[in-house]
Amino acid sequence: MAYCQVVISKEILDAVLQLVSTYSNYISRYVDYLNNLIAVQRRVSTLRFERMTLIKYVKKLRFMADVLHSWSFEGENDLIGKRLNEVIDPLGAYLIKVFEILDLLNFYITQPMRGETISKTLNEDLVVSEETIVCINDSYRIYIKGIQWLVESISERNGNCPHLALELIEFTRKCAIEDEVDFTASEDILLQDVAIVEVEEEYVDLLHDWSAILVQKQTEMKELFSEDSKRWASMTKPVKK
């Protein structure tokens, strides 16, 4: 197996924590968004089950966002000069765990819950908008690719590390192979290979680049979340007599 020859430095640790902060903020956006939706559902008695389910997701996501927000590297000075996987592997494994839950949440709010809400209330304004669904799915793919890059840019793929396997990446590759898709010609970001970094400056620059890309996607999602939340809030305001 090929490994990145770059070792841990103070600059790398700082850049990694910046990336972690971006992921933490991303999860926090979901928490705020879901809380707004829960507030609306509280006024509709027929959506009791949907509300309880979202509350469960919110509690779990809030905990995970807090864990990422407080992520640190104990014994930082002792880590300097050691291999990158000592700090990247645990982080990658935790992010994968978080995004497996987020995958289930995305499916729930964009499909089953959406259908049930419309069926029970006959109101399409009490659900996640079509535009937001597109953004959620697109952002999720980009954030997953960021995790893949974080893990695979320091060592080539290894089937002996199931805790670092990304289901969406594996499934997309499997389907592409079955369909005889040329990976090198595909525009699907999930099929694009990740190159192992060779020098510290390159790794730090790429960490910053990924942080910038993810912040941009997060901003797009935040705007749509805000539009949905405003629409929901307007529907729950009492009518003035």
From Swiss-Prot:
One of its GO terms (cellular component) is nucleus. One of its GO terms (molecular function) is RNA binding. InterPro entries: RNA-bd_She2 (IPR024261), She2_dom_sf (IPR036827). Signal peptide: none annotated. Disulfide bonds: none annotated. Its main location: cytoplasm. It is found in: Cytoplasm; Nucleus. GO terms for biological process: mRNA transport. It comes from the Eukaryota. Keywords: Cytoplasm, mRNA transport, Nucleus, RNA-binding, Transport. The keyword Hydrolase does not apply. RNA-binding protein that binds specific mRNAs including the ASH1 mRNA, coding for a repressor of the HO endonuclease. Part of the mRNA localization machinery that restricts accumulation of certain proteins to the bud and in the daughter cell. Belongs to the SHE2 family. Homodimer and homotetramer. This is SWI5-dependent HO expression protein 2.
